[in-house]
């Protein structure tokens, strides 16, 4: 009898998730024709979910910048979605950055994700931080600016407190939104959110959600992003190296559970790192009630 009651409670618990959430999606510029087809298939598949915006990542060199610019403009023109380019302060002068920002504004782009960017080896120029970039963008036009946060601390930060102060500096410079690095330890995120509030950051801390379809790739990414991979996640993917179908099912389950838990903790907005693949993200959103 008690078992039946537990099952009934579990079923009700699953059915009770009817909170409306907002989603946004990240894509990256394709490097060949096949990847470009995949990108546009993904964009068109996910646009029907009416995301708040979609972002497009960015490399420091001019070729990458041009690709990002072209894709963002095309998304805006062809789909009507709010498209946000990533912009970094690496390998461009302040005047060049101002011109890039003006070009975006003139193209109808109103949202930008402002980042410092990764400094290449031997980089000797004076640092141009994300807070500097936010301030520069504010001087050009009234952009809607998102910045990055690191619940498990940026790998180059001297301390967790120094990293938090740096985030506050970006907010004080004029950033409107905060998007986190992907993570899997929800307690860490919640503690980080509390610490943000304690120093006066009242902007919503939007969690970055990465559905993990390639665990080995995740391990490589985690090694240089300072993201901790919990033991339960290692166990979940154990033995699945040659089983992509099951990996996708695990990825969907983990992502859905994370969103449900975070939603009950008051989180309303979620940013999905799609890796230019729509099927899994679409399925996750569908199960969370985000539908056309």
Swiss-Prot record:
According to its UniProt entry, the function of this protein is described as:
Catalyzes the NADH-dependent reduction of 5,10-methylenetetrahydrofolate to 5-methyltetrahydrofolate. Is required to provide the methyl group necessary for methionine synthetase to convert homocysteine to methionine; the methyl group is given by 5-methyltetrahydrofolate.
UniProt lineage: Bacteria, Pseudomonadati, Pseudomonadota, Gammaproteobacteria, Pasteurellales
Reactions catalysed, as given in the entry:
(6S)-5-methyl-5,6,7,8-tetrahydrofolate + NAD(+) = (6R)-5,10-methylene-5,6,7,8-tetrahydrofolate + NADH + H(+)
Q: What is this protein called?
A: 5,10-methylenetetrahydrofolate reductase
* Pfam families named among the record's database cross-references: MTHFR
Q: Which InterPro entries match?
A: FAD-linked_oxidoreductase-like (IPR029041), Mehydrof_redctse-like (IPR003171), MTHF_reductase_bac (IPR004620)
Which EC number applies?
Answer: 1.5.1.54
List of residues binding (6S)-5-methyl-5,6,7,8-tetrahydrofolate: 118, 181, 217, 277
Family to which the UniProt record says this protein belongs: Belongs to the methylenetetrahydrofolate reductase family.
Gene name in the database record = metF
Record-level GO BP terms? methionine biosynthetic process; tetrahydrofolate interconversion
Q: Does the keyword Ribosomal protein apply?
A: no
Name the pathway.
One-carbon metabolism; tetrahydrofolate interconversion; Amino-acid biosynthesis; L-methionine biosynthesis via de novo pathway
Give yes or no: UniProt keyword Protein transport. Answer: no
Bilayer-crossing regions: none
Chain positions recorded as FAD binding sites:
58, 60, 86, 116-118, 130, 150, 154, 157, 163, 166, 169-170
